[in-house]
Design a protein with these regions (language model features):
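Extracytoplasmic/periplasmic sensor domains and loops in membrane signaling proteins
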Residues: 1, 20-57, 72, 85
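A short, hydrophobic, proline-anchored segment that marks a local hinge/packing element in signaling
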Residues: 58, 66-76, 87
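Sensory beta-strand/linker motifs that couple input domains to effectors
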Residues: 80-84
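Helix-loop-beta substructure at the N-terminus of cytosolic sensory domains
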Residues: 2-6
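Beta-strand residues that line the small-molecule/cofactor-binding core
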Residues: 63
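Short hydrophobic alpha-helical segments used for membrane anchoring or interfacial signaling
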Residues: 8-14
Length: 88
């Protein structure tokens, strides 16, 4: 079987990265839209600082090899992020 590619678009309000569009499912098998990126996640600090993050991440009990990239406005402030990953 081929690996499933997952993708997420996050909005950022200065405190939370919230999943606004995603193919990622929760542990219960429901869409993860509306859930937040864990502030303890390694990607959170990088994204909040305007930096990308690539590595192994865990979401809803599943491990992924993935990359996150910040989205910024014209003023350079972080407004969101993108995630693309493959479940391990």
């Amino acid at each position: 079987s081929s690996a499933r590619l997952e993708a997420t678009v996050f909005s950022y309000d200065g405190k939370d990265f919230t999943r606004t569009k995603t193919t990622v499912l929760t542990a219960e098998g429901k869409s993860a839209v509306g859930t937040k990126l864990d502030p303890a996640a390694p990607a959170y600090k990088a994204l909040a600082g305007g930096h990308s993050f690539t590595g192994e991440v865990t979401a809803f009990g599943k491990k992924y090899d993935g990359s996150y990239a910040p989205l910024t406005g014209a003023d350079g402030k972080v407004t969101g992020a993108l995630f693309v990953g493959v479940a391990k």
